[in-house]
Amino acid sequence: MTEEFEIAGISTGAWWSSPTNTAAVFSGYSLPCSTEISPDVTNFGWQNFDNKINDHNDGCMNMHNSFFEGLLIDPNDQLLPDPWSKSTIPNAKSELLENFPFLDNMFLVDSEAESLLDHEIRNHKSSKEQITQDYKNLTSKRSEELEENSDEYSPRLLKRPRLETLSPLPSFKVRKEKLGDRITALQQLVSPFGKTDTASVLNEAVEYIKFLQEQVTVLSNPEQNTIGSVQQQQCSNKKSINTQGEVEEDECSPRRYVDLSSRGLCLMPISASYPVAAAAASAAEMNVHLVSGIFHSL
């Protein structure tokens, strides 16, 4: 039996007499260690009982230390065993893709989806930047328009409405005419004898105006017998202006000015019509009384 333990790599001697070799066999495993084996050991009749117990305790401590050393792994050590080294991983991947072609298609679809996703993200970013830029431009333009409107309308609000004093008389528009146009108009108005020179036209106009003034004066005073004096004054004025005596005497004859209505307007004020109407009424009453008296006498 001792030979079998020697072949297994345990040192010679009894297996119970070498606690260190037992710890080496069970290195990396948790074995229960206790001092309860001391009564069993005393049965063999060993002399150094205390030394054996100490050796056994030291072996248990060595076993625990070797177990914890097995748990503490160096991070720099390779996790893969020697047959599966890093150099063999690409070869295994290529063999896996050859055996399963759908995996290659899956990787291709994943790459295309990733590229499409990147493209969509770029488009989204660019569109977002464009929207923000447009919003900034719009806000700046709106602020400029508001500033322009405020500058445009602010003076108008500050200005007070000007109070215009209305003139009591209506404004008459003076018509601008040339002197030649006025003379032509006068020629058409007062040129019954075909006179076209300026002096004769002006004289005709002046005389016609004087005649109208005299007629208005005579008609406004019907009770006064001033017809003769007016005619004499008019004839004297005409004789002083003109040199043709015979013609003026004929024109200034009293027979010419008896009918004033033949020379122009016959104006009569309303106040002068009342005595005429009263006289006519009294004459009518007198005629009625006369007729009635005649009928009574018959």
Swiss-Prot record:
InterPro entries: bHLH95_bHLH (IPR045239), bHLH_dom (IPR011598), HLH_DNA-bd_sf (IPR036638), IND-like (IPR045843). Residues 163-212 form the bHLH domain. The keyword Nucleus applies. CDD domains: bHLH_AtbHLH_like. The keyword Transcription regulation applies. One of its GO terms (molecular function) is DNA-binding transcription factor activity. Keywords: Coiled coil, DNA-binding, Nucleus, Transcription, Transcription regulation. It comes from the Eukaryota. Residues 129-140 have a biased composition (Polar residues). Differentiating root endodermis. It is found in: Nucleus. Residues 117-149 form a coiled coil. GO terms for cellular component: nucleus. PANTHER family: TRANSCRIPTION FACTOR BHLH114, TRANSCRIPTION FACTOR BHLH83-RELATED. This is Transcription factor bHLH114. It comes from Arabidopsis thaliana (Mouse-ear cress).
